[in-house]
A protein has these predicted regions:
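ATP/NTP phosphate-donor binding region
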Residues: 1-95, 344
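Glycine/threonine-rich beta-strand-loop-alpha-helix active-site module
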Residues: 79-182
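Glycine-rich phosphate/pyrophosphate-binding beta-alpha loops
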Residues: 145, 252-285, 364-368
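Carboxylate- and glycine-rich phosphate/diphosphate-binding segment that chelates Mg2+/Mn2+
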Residues: 153-261
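Flexible, glycine/charged-enriched surface loops at secondary-structure junctions
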Residues: 210-219, 234-246, 261-266, 318-324, ...
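Gly/Pro-rich interdomain helix-loop hinge
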Residues: 276-353
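Short, amphipathic C-terminal "tail helix"
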Residues: 350-387
Length: 387
């Protein structure tokens, strides 16, 4: 096999496993932090002895002063970043600690960008548009899904246009990521299901991406295998530590894969559902994934056949196309087994919005690495199939 040149980005330091949270204080010290802005949401902050309380304990034990911003919303908004930036500046913070899933991590990255770059955040949408270093970011992760703790992506919603935009830059990479599966124990089944399908979407889209390489393929394949074997158990019994740990590892691998291979039409389309309808990102991905997979199947049937086998399907004796079809069946069955809604019509989506969402999806940065190039009519048709 002939390899083209490729690069591979990951955060500087990653800690994984039970009680990994215990390193957060010392790691902030090593980053030179004196006063941290802890970015989270009100729900996480309210949990007694939860991830926020544990993070605060270890930060204070290390002598790090802390200011808290808990105004992060799902599908974080540019207004959340503005409010968090005000706290960052008022409290004269020099390091950002994000605690939660993708929303706090992306909001924290946005605060870092706004603190070091002039003008509206939207003007930095795109790839490698940032010119200045951000404050150090230490990302404490509590969900197995978005993997924002290990990626260069910052996804925010423009509240005026209701469009999600993505700022992709190596400068967004957290200096430290912490994945402690003990912080994921007891998360609600619906959240576990949605974030788990987000992780699966990351792995599948990275694997079939035009920008995939041998290293991203290896990470994506193992992520798909782990998710197929553990997501049902994590949803059924939230206290199953082995399933939680395997899902956390799968999410980490999927994040490292798409951080380098990029994504595709599932995410480009899901961002429109999140922007217009504030739909949970994992749910949007889960509903769209089988339909986009069917559209992409002819672009790389061999890899879809691999996905089928990784998900436990018996493809012995089948043609490549028949084996590839089994991947779509396996994805759909997993989604149904864990209680994900199967149709956009059940989630309040309006058919009249499909042409606009299709137009905007093709402008989304994730669209450019999709293995099959589509047009607005084809993307609108995929929305209708998912409806």
């Amino acid at each position: 096999m002939s390899y083209r040149m490729f690069d591979y980005l990951v955060p500087n330091v990653n800690f994984f496993g039970p009680n990994a949270i215990s390193v957060v204080g010392e790691r902030c010290q090593l980053q030179g932090g004196k006063k941290a802005l802890l970015v989270t949401d009100k729900g996480l902050r309210a949990i007694k002895d939860g991830a926020v309380d544990k993070t605060l304990h270890y930060l204070r034990e290390a002598g790090i002063e802390v200011a808290i911003f808990d105004g992060v919303e799902p599908n974080p908004k540019d207004t959340n970043v503005r409010d968090g930036l005000a706290v960052f500046r008022r409290e004269q913070c020099d390091i950002i600690i994000t605690v939660g899933g993708g929303s706090p991590h992306d909001c924290g990255k946005g605060i870092g960008i706004a603190a070091t770059h002039e003008g509206d955040l939207y003007q930095y949408a795109g790839i490698e548009t940032l010119t200045n270093p951000l404050p150090p970011i230490v990302a404490v992760n509590t969900t197995a899904g978005t993997a924002s703790e290990v990626t260069r992506h910052c996804v925010l919603t423009n509240t005026e246009t209701k469009v999600k935009f993505v700022i992709v830059s190596w400068r967004n990479l957290p200096s430290v990521s912490i994945n402690d599966p003990l912080l994921m124990i007891g998360k609600p089944a619906a959240l576990t299901a949605a974030t788990g399908m987000d992780a699966l979407t990351h792995a599948v889209e990275a694997y079939i991406s035009k920008d995939a390489n041998p290293v991203t393929d290896a990470a994506a394949m193992q992520a798909i295998r782990l998710i197929a074997r553990n997501l049902r158990q994590a949803v059924a019994l939230g206290s199953n530590l082995q399933a939680r740990e395997n899902m956390a590892y799968a999410s980490l691998l999927a994040g490292m894969a798409f951080n380098n291979a990029n994504l595709g039409y599932v995410h480009a389309m899901a961002h429109q559902l999140g922007g217009l309808y504030d739909m949970p990102h994992g749910v949007a991905n889960a509903v769209l994934l089988p339909h986009v997979a069917r559209y992409n199947l002819i672009a790389n049937p061999e890899k879809f056949a691999d996905i089928a086998e990784l998900m436990g399907e018996n493809i012995t004796g089948l043609s490549t196309l028949d084996a590839a079809e089994k991947a779509i069946a396996a994805i759909t069955r997993l989604s149904m087994d864990i209680g994900i809604p199967q149709h956009l019509r059940d989630l309040g989506v309006k058919e009249a919005d499909f042409p606009y969402m299709a137009e905007m999806a093709l402008k989304d940065g994730n669209a450019f690495s999709n293995p099959r190039k589509g047009n607005e009519q084809e993307i609108a048709a995929i929305f209708r199939q998912a409806f």
